[in-house]
Curated annotation (Swiss-Prot):
Keywords recorded for this protein, A-Z: Cell membrane, Cell wall biogenesis/degradation, Membrane, Transmembrane, Transmembrane helix
Gene Ontology terms: cellular component: plasma membrane
BP GO terms, sorted: cell wall organization
Topology of this chain in the membrane: Multi-pass membrane protein
Subunit structure: Homodimer and heterodimers.
Gene source species: Raphanus sativus (Radish)
Role this protein plays: Regulates membrane-cell wall junctions and localized cell wall deposition. Required for establishment of the Casparian strip membrane domain (CSD) and the subsequent formation of Casparian strips, a cell wall modification of the root endodermis that determines an apoplastic barrier between the intraorganismal apoplasm and the extraorganismal apoplasm and prevents lateral diffusion.
InterPro entries hit by this protein: CASP/CASPL, CASP_dom, CASPL
Protein name, per record: Casparian strip membrane protein 2
Length: 204
């Protein structure tokens, strides 16, 4: 009968086994969190690189449009034929808007660095999402309006008797068209940035 009393050790083993299983649950959660953090950090690094590329695109757009002035080599006693961005309010708006966009991207770089250091922080990522969306709208408005004026400069408008001027002001049209293309490249970068922020927030 005394030998049968040895079966009381079984509950102790089961309880110790249950105690041993508890830390494993915590370890699994830690691995999940670290995996999500690593994924978001990768997105944040890509976000930072895209912002550097967007700075280049927006700065090139503003600078090219700003230096697009052209003066024809011939003139009369009373007239000098010159074309510049400041002759058209749309191109003036374009230069101002793209300059503001460039400044914003520079100011957003520290926030992007914060998302790299703290990949699971939602507040900086949400702030970037809201601001990037607003600035993307400004960039798209400037690019679209400048593209419309550039089209008229190249092709004219028969309904309103607006003649194309690019045959005379070739360099001016080339620079303004290049600025418009660069601004649309910046728009594409902003679209990708907004998508990245949305994906990163979804992973939180």
């Amino acid at each position: 009968m005394k030998n049968e009393s040895t079966f009381i050790d079984v509950p102790a083993d089961s309880s110790s086994a249950m105690k041993g299983k508890a830390p494993l649950i915590g370890v699994a959660k830690d691995h999940t969190a670290s995996g999500s953090g690593g994924y978001n950090r990768g997105l944040s690094i890509f976000d930072f690189l895209l912002r550097l590329a967007a700075i280049v695109a927006a700065s090139v757009a503003a600078g090219t449009m700003f230096t697009s002035d052209e003066t024809l080599p011939f003139f009369t006693q009373f007239l000098q034929f010159e074309a510049g961005y400041d002759d058209l309010p749309t191109f003036q708006f374009f230069v101002i808007a793209m300059s503001l966009v460039s400044g914003y991207i520079v100011l957003s770089l520290p926030i992007s660095v914060v998302t790299i250091v703290r990949p699971l922080a939602a507040a900086p990522r949400l702030l970037l999402l809201v601001l990037d969306t607003a600035v993307m709208g400004l960039t798209m408005a400037a690019a679209s309006s400048a593209a419309a004026i550039s089209y008229v400069a190249h092709n004219g408008n028969q309904n309103t008797n607006w003649l194309p001027i690019c045959q005379q002001f070739f360099d001016f049209c080339q620079k303004t068209s290049g600025a418009v293309v660069s601004s649309f490249v910046a728009v594409v970068f902003f679209m990708i940035l907004v998508v990245l922020s949305g994906v990163a927030l979804e992973r939180h």
